[in-house]
């Protein structure tokens, strides 16, 4: 009987893990949709990116790509090239945390585009432990750096419901 109860226990544990994974997957999709909606606040014409930082199922920060505070809300120059001082969504979300009483240590970042290498460095230093994204950036070096740092990286396909 011990083998049967042990096997039943294993099945029960797997079912609980599947349920937990399914719930996490549903949450990931919802937060990514919210980050996508948040990206609509960006004044950038070429690409709109949104980011949320979530800890204990609470959004503790948000950001979208754009110019620094006090600058004109124009991201591209006359040749449609992104100005060098435009901040990425991840950087905006992380710097908001720095100006608040919150901590991003152990949090999850939801970002509509996979992070570039510069943002990956900020994510690592901010103590974020998980990154969920929904669009591939042309370069994968940011994702590789996050993985090297032991950060869980998850791609969510928003085309499937």
Regions picked out by a protein language model, each given a short descriptive name:
Residues 18-26, 33, 60-160:
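Zn2+-dependent cytidine deaminase-like catalytic core
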Residues 48-62:
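Short beta-strand scaffold segments in enzyme catalytic cores
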Residues 23-47:
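Short, basic/aromatic recognition patches
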Residues 10, 28, 50, 90:
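Acidic active-site catalytic centers that drive phospho-/nucleotidyl reactions
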Residues 7-8, 51, 98:
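Long alpha-helical scaffolds
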Residues 1-15:
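Single conserved hydrophobic/aromatic residue that forms the stacking wall/gate
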């Amino acid at each position: 009987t011990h083998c049967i109860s042990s096997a039943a226990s294993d099945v029960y544990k797997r079912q609980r893990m599947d349920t937990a994974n399914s719930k996490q997957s549903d949450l990931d999709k919802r937060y990514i949709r919210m980050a996508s909606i948040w990206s609509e606040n960006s004044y950038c014409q070429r690409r709109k990116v949104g980011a949320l930082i979530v800890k204990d199922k609470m959004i503790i920060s948000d950001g979208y790509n754009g110019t620094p505070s006090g600058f004109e809300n124009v991201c591209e120059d006359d040749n449609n090239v992104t100005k060098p001082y435009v901040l990425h969504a991840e950087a905006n979300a992380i710097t908001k945390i720095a100006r608040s009483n919150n901590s991003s240590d152990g949090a999850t970042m939801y970002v509509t585009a996979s992070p570039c290498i510069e943002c990956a460095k900020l994510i690592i230093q901010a103590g974020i432990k998980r990154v969920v994204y929904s669009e591939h950036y042309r370069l994968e070096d940011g994702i590789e750096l996050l993985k090297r740092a032991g950060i869980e990286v998850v791609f969510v396909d928003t085309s499937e419901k």
